[in-house]
Regions:
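Acidic, glycine-rich flexible loop/linker segments
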Residues: 1-106, 110-130
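Conserved alpha/beta-domain cores
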Residues: 70-282
């Protein structure tokens, strides 16, 4: 993706993995075309434009274009905060130079997928893991660490720490993991610890996992990583966000569990947000 002049996909939407990563890389991308791979040929010269409204356009051949530069200093400052949505720590220092108020959303899923690759419970309950191939791969990944859990907390804290350091002292709001059960199952060793759901989109995800005995040990690793970032690294600009919280009672349970794991709301100005994404939140 870094080498491509532009990216065109048959499937996906604005929130798909390809679209999100393309935006972070500053790459021109059109997703969800349906049949681009059938209509375009290898070696064909085309021009891809994402500057003409909500729909991207693909033109035959190489077209010329004009570049218009805008002096941001003449525009003044907005009354509201303008913050970025970022996931890739490697892009943090590039975007930290932008005139923004911080990061409004950093998703942990990308860091877990790319830097860790293993299911949290496959690490904390490694001795229970039945998949021999997954065990071998996890052994290889964690060979340089004192234990399986520190592999998770060190890698996750480094990813978040890189983002927070780049933007310090501006806020970086980190959303705790929001994998759906089918996505958790795709992590190394994950299938053993995840139920098969008919509709994972509204299933065992978000806040409901954090205090549940079936995943509580995994959430403990996430909390420890965030504690390391805030306390050991001193990056207290990190705020935390809880996704898919269905009820007030559920939110209170999560707050209690986070305090149990060293993240007390209000301590050292720790702020804990809820992501407003389902009707009951409103």
């Amino acid at each position: 993706m870094k080498r491509a002049s532009a990216i065109i996909t048959n499937g996906g939407g604005r929130t798909s993995h390809a679209a999100i990563v393309a935006r972070e890389l500053g790459a021109v991308a059109i997703v969800g075309t349906g049949d681009a791979t059938e209509k375009l040929e290898d070696g064909q010269e085309i021009t891809v434009s994402c500057a003409e409204g909500n729909e991207g356009k693909v033109y035959e051949g190489k077209l010329e274009w004009d570049t218009e530069e805008i002096d941001l200093e003449e525009m003044g400052d907005p009354d509201t905060q303008v913050m970025l949505i970022l996931a890739n720590p490697k892009m943090a220092y590039k975007y930290a130079s932008y005139p923004v108020d911080g990061v409004g959303l950093m998703r942990l899923e990308f860091a877990i997928n790319n830097a860790i690759k293993a299911h949290p419970l496959a690490l904390s309950r490694f001795d229970e893991l039945e998949d021999e191939e997954a065990k071998r791969k996890i052994e290889d990944l964690t060979a340089a660490y004192p234990d399986k859990e520190s592999y998770f907390t060190e890698n996750l804290s480094q990813a978040v720490g890189a983002m927070a350091a780049a933007f310090y002292p501006r806020e970086v709001i980190v959303r705790m993991s929001d994998f759906k059960t089918n996505e958790y199952a795709d992590l190394l060793g994950g299938k053993q610890f995840e139920p098969k759901e008919e509709n994972p989109m509204v299933g065992f995800r978000g806040a409901s996992r954090y205090y549940n005995e079936r995943y509580k040990d995994g959430f403990k690793l996430e909390c420890e990583a965030m504690r390391i970032v805030r306390e050991d690294m001193g990056l207290d600009n990190v705020k935390l966000m809880i996704p898919f919280c269905r009820t007030v009672d559920e939110g209170k349970k999560v707050i209690e569990v986070m305090e149990e794991y060293g993240l007390k709301q209000g301590k050292d100005n720790l702020e804990i947000y809820v992501m407003c994404e389902i009707p009951s939140n409103v």
